[in-house]
């Protein structure tokens, strides 16, 4: 990036993408989050080849520092939300595995006929 304002604009674009990704994570829109991550990574790659020169004004450096801090905070929050989702999925997988093991071991129990038989036997007493 040749222009310092272009660099600032690139940082602001990454911030915008970061905020959108955080909103997607908060709303549990995981597929959209994954799709947006590709765009986000491409934007990060653009600035990774750039550097802030020593001639960059202090106020511009401060703006970029503030933007980076917000981006990092957003990333940490996204990671927490992703970990929470991973834990939920792990729990569901464990439950499904246990259910499959029970079904394999004992066969699948028909819920309704058993329930009706149980209800009929208690009504007759």
UniProtKB/Swiss-Prot annotation:
* Gene3D superfamilies, sorted: Flagellar protein flit
Keyword Coiled coil set for record: no
| Alphabetic keyword roster | Bacterial flagellum biogenesis, Chaperone, Cytoplasm, Repressor, Transcription, Transcription regulation
UniProt superkingdom = Bacteria
Biological processes per GO annotation: bacterial-type flagellum organization; negative regulation of bacterial-type flagellum assembly; protein folding
Short name of any one Pfam family annotated for the protein: FliT
Which cellular compartments is it found in?
Answer: Cytoplasm, Cytosol
Q: What is its main location?
A: cytoplasm
Region of interest: Required for homodimerization: 1-50
Note down the stretches annotated as region FliD binding: 60-98
Its cellular-component GO annotations read:
cytosol
Protein family: Belongs to the FliT family.
* Function, in words: Dual-function protein that regulates the transcription of class 2 flagellar operons and that also acts as an export chaperone for the filament-capping protein FliD. As a transcriptional regulator, acts as an anti-FlhDC factor; it directly binds FlhC, thus inhibiting the binding of the FlhC/FlhD complex to class 2 promoters, resulting in decreased expression of class 2 flagellar operons. As a chaperone, effects FliD transition to the membrane by preventing its premature polymerization, and by directing it to the export apparatus.
Q: How does it assemble?
A: Homodimer. Interacts with FliD and FlhC.
Q: What is this protein called?
A: Flagellar protein FliT
């Amino acid at each position: 990036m040749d222009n310092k304002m272009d660099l600032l604009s690139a940082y602001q674009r990454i911030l915008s993408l970061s905020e959108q990704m955080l909103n997607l994570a908060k709303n549990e829109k995981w597929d959209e989050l994954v799709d947006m991550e590709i765009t986000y990574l491409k934007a990060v790659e653009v600035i990774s080849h750039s550097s802030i020169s020593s001639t960059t004004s202090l106020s511009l450096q401060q703006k970029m520092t503030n933007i980076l801090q917000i981006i990092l905070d957003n990333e940490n929050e996204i990671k927490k939300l992703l970990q929470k989702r991973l834990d939920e999925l792990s729990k569901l997988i464990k439950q499904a595995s246990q259910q499959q093991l029970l079904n394999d071991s004992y066969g699948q129990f028909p819920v309704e006929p058993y329930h009706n038989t149980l209800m009929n036997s208690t009504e007759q007493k």
